[in-house]
Each structure stands twice: as structure tokens, then as C-alpha cells.
A protein has these predicted regions:
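Active-site metal-binding loops of divalent metal-dependent hydrolases
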Residues: 1, 79, 109
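Active-site and channel-lining beta-strand-loop segments
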Residues: 1-13
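Residues in well-ordered beta-strands of folded domains
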Residues: 4, 105, 142
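Short beta-strand-to-turn element immediately C-terminal to the catalytic PLP-Schiff-base lysine
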Residues: 4-5, 23-24, 118-122
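Sequence-level motif detector for i,i+2 pairs with an aromatic at +2
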Residues: 9, 102, 135-138
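Glycine-rich loop-to-alpha-helix module at the N-terminal edge of alpha/beta enzyme cores
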Residues: 10-98, 105
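A short helix-loop
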Residues: 101-103, 110
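PLP-dependent aminotransferase-class I/II
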Residues: 108-148
Length: 148
């Protein structure tokens, strides 16, 4: 698949957007599935409501997951997913009587999203710099390097 810039130059799309667009571009099966679902119910906020596709996907995810994982929690995207994971880790340690376990370690050069919580965990200083007064404390370690 090629992407074309404003000057008409074409590029092979080898990144899938921000590394999350894994379904390709213009796939007719995906477009048809979206259209069929939109004709039934375009959206139902899963925090309060449910829908048949949401229930089916939850069942499939639970079925494929290791046995200790029996629940699904839907969020709107990657930033919210990482933010929720940080909050879940905090809740876990609080409920286990370990409130002192609050430190987060993340990798330099990493990207976890755009909310304040995950921006703090992100490893790109230039993304964080102007927001540092608002961010939680996170330690950053070296990124993976397979050739060292």
C-alpha cells in the first residue's frame, strides 16, 4: 500500500500508522464488517452498556487468555489502555497492603501514549519536557539493544 504526500510523492506504508493500524488500508472485508455493524448499532459505551459484538469479543478474549484471566475491560485506545494498566498496578499493590510500591520503571525512547500518566512513562524527553511539572515520577532505563 502506498501513501502519497501533498507533493504527490508516494511512500510504501510499512509502519501501519502509529504502529496500531494493523488491518491495512481499504480491506473490503473489514469495510463490510464495519458497515454491517454500523447499520445495527454504531456504538454503545461499554462502561454502562453492552452490545452483541462486545460480548462476543469478550468471550473470545477470555477463551484465548490464560485461565487466570476471566474478565475483559474495554477502553478507547492505546493511551487509555496503558493508563488503565498503571492504575491497575497501583490498585493491586494497595489491596495487597503494599502502598509503598508505587515506582514505575519504563524504557528510554519508548512511546506509551498521550495522557499525562503515560506521557510520564514515555521515554522521549522532548515529548515530556513542557509537561514535567504535571507528571508522576518514573525512572527510565536503556532501551533494548540486541547487538550489544
Amino acid at each position: 500500500m502506498y501513501l502519497t504526500d501533498a507533493k504527490g510523492k508516494e511512500y510504501i506504508d510499512a509502519s501501519g500508522g502509529a504502529a496500531v493500524s494493523c488491518l491495512g488500508h481499504g480491506d473490503s472485508d473489514v469495510i463490510k464488517a464495519i458497515q454491517v455493524q454500523a447499520d445495527k448499532l454504531a456504538f454503545a459505551h461499554t462502561g454502562f452498556l453492552s452490545s452483541e459484538p462486545a460480548e462476543q469479543l469478550a468471550d473470545l478474549l477470555v477463551e484465548k487468555a490464560p485461565s487466570q484471566f476471566g474478565k475483559v475491560f474495554y477502553v478507547s485506545g492505546g493511551s487509555e489502555a496503558v493508563e488503565s494498566a498503571l492504575k491497575l498496578a497501583r490498585q493491586y499493590h494497595l489491596e495487597n497492603g503494599e502502598p509503598q510500591r508505587r515506582h514505575i520503571i519504563a524504557r528510554q525512547q519508548s512511546f506509551h501514549g498521550n495522557t499525562l500518566g503515560v506521557l510520564a512513562a514515555g521515554g522521549n524527553q522532548w515529548r515530556r519536557k513542557q509537561f514535567e511539572p504535571l507528571l508522576i515520577e518514573v525512572s527510565h532505563i536503556s532501551p533494548c539493544f540486541a547487538y550489544r
